[in-house]
């Protein structure tokens, strides 16, 4: 069983055990009307749009430094991030919906609920906690699930980042007419990353979609490797959580877009 399969099985058990219904009942509703649109930011931004992530750990990383997360959000906002991603998985990533709810009020930037969504109830909880965007991972969903969850999220006025790991999944994302597509550079079987995976997947990409490269981006040299793939932005977590000088580091990553 892969790590991803294990996580999905865990999410299924949480759904069956009433975890998400309890969250829906106990979390206060946070209004997201003041949140900016990430897609609008991409359209207006001549440089790469940055989704800056808040994370405490992952299945492959357990030594991330502890940060004042309110300050981290403020720094992301101040130094050029266009959106914030917040992990809400507790067991594998050390996040929570309570954390999302506490931090989303600290910024007007779009906030992405980064989780493993397989049921509309999870979308309801994400929105109630104050997310304005959600992640849908093509690899863990059937075509019907992907379409239904995508359409449901859009109906709730949420933006949707549809994540793909190979060209076949990219075609599946096109079928639901996903406007915002994340290309994950992580090998799902071995959980190792290669940023140039983005170049391979986007070699014959379609226009009228926006592409975000995710995972394995540690510095400006990594960004330069994939700049000519035609990406519109980056999702970066570990490198930002480790960085002690975001005022210099974050702007370095916001390179001018190269459109083919």
From Swiss-Prot:
Pathway: Amino-acid biosynthesis; L-tryptophan biosynthesis; L-tryptophan from chorismate: step 4/5. Keywords: Amino-acid biosynthesis, Aromatic amino acid biosynthesis, Decarboxylase, Lyase, Tryptophan biosynthesis. GO terms for biological process: L-tryptophan biosynthetic process. It is an enzyme of class 4 (lyase). One of its GO terms (molecular function) is phosphoribosylanthranilate isomerase activity. The keyword Secreted does not apply. The keyword Amino-acid biosynthesis applies. Pfam families: IGPS. It catalyses: 1-(2-carboxyphenylamino)-1-deoxy-D-ribulose 5-phosphate + H(+) = (1S,2R)-1-C-(indol-3-yl)glycerol 3-phosphate + CO2 + H2O. Belongs to the TrpC family. This is Indole-3-glycerol phosphate synthase. It comes from Staphylococcus aureus (strain NCTC 8325 / PS 47).
């Amino acid at each position: 069983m892969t790590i991803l399969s294990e996580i999905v099985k865990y999410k299924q058990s949480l759904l069956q055990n009433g975890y998400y219904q309890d969250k829906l009942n106990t979390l206060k509703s946070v209004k997201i009307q003041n949140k900016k649109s990430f897609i609008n930011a991409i359209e207006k931004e001549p440089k790469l749009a940055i989704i800056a992530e808040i994370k405490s750990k992952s299945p492959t990383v357990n030594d991330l430094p502890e940060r004042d997360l309110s300050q981290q959000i403020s720094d992301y906002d101040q130094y050029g991030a266009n959106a914030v991603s917040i992990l809400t998985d507790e067991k594998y990533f050390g996040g929570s919906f309570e954390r999302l709810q506490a931090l989303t009020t600290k910024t007007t930037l779009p906030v992405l609920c980064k989780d493993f969504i397989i049921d509309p109830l999870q979308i309801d909880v994400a929105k109630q906690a104050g997310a304005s965007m959600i992640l849908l991972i093509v690899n863990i969903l059937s075509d019907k699930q992907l379409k239904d969850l995508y359409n449901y999220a859009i109906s709730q006025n949420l933006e949707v980042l549809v994540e793909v790991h190979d060209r076949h999944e990219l075609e599946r994302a096109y079928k639901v007419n996903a406007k915002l597509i994340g290309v994950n550079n992580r090998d799902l079987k071995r959980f190792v990353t290669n940023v140039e995976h983005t170049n391979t997947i986007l070699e014959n990409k379609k226009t009228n979609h926006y592409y975000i490269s995710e995972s394995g981006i540690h510095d400006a040299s990594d960004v330069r490797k994939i700049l000519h793939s035609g990406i519109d932005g980056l999702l970066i977590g570990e490198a930002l959580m480790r960085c002690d000088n975001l005022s210099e580091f974050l702007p370095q990553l916001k390179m001018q877009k190269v459109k083919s």
